[in-house]
Structures are given as C-alpha cells and as structure tokens.
Amino acid sequence: AVSVDCSEYPKPACTMEYRPLCGSDNKTYGNKCNFCNAVVESNGTLTLSRFGKC
C-alpha cells in the first residue's frame, strides 16, 4: 500500500506546489500538505489511493 507521513500536520497554510495525490475519497489533492490536512480533519479515515491524479 502507498502511504505518506502526515505526522507533522495539520499545517495552517500550504504552498501552491503541484504534486497531486489521489485520496481514498476519489478526490485529487494538489500536494501532500493539502492531503495531510484533509487526513487530519477526517480523523484518519481518509487514506492515500495513489500518487498522481485520481
């Protein structure tokens, strides 16, 4: 399984860097920061499906 380390999140602001990640909610997140913030908000229910766009 693919995974990312979200231990240093949430962060108050994310950069505009575009390195897309596909979440288990079938939504494409622009970068790791955006994805990890969403993971924290979901209380860990959101996981990474794959790197790249959904």
Curated annotation (Swiss-Prot):
Gene3D superfamilies, alphabetized: 3.30.60.30
GO molecular function term, any single one: serine-type endopeptidase inhibitor activity
UniProt entry tagged with the keyword Repeat: yes
Family matches, as InterPro entries: Bifunctional_prot_inhibitor, Kazal_dom, Kazal_dom_sf, Prot_inh_Kazal-m
Site (Reactive bond 3): 16-17
Localisation per UniProt entry: Secreted
Glycosylation: residue positions: 43
One Pfam family cited in the UniProt record for this chain: Kazal_1
Domain Kazal-like: 4-54
UniProt main location, coarse: secreted
Record keywords, A-Z: Disulfide bond, Glycoprotein, Protease inhibitor, Repeat, Secreted, Serine protease inhibitor
A Gene Ontology cellular-component term: extracellular space
Cystine bridges: 6-36, 14-33, 22-54
Annotated TM spans: none
Domain characteristics, as noted in the entry: Avian ovomucoid consists of three homologous, tandem Kazal family inhibitory domains.
Record-given protein name: Ovomucoid
Species in which this protein is naturally found: Syrmaticus mikado (Mikado pheasant)
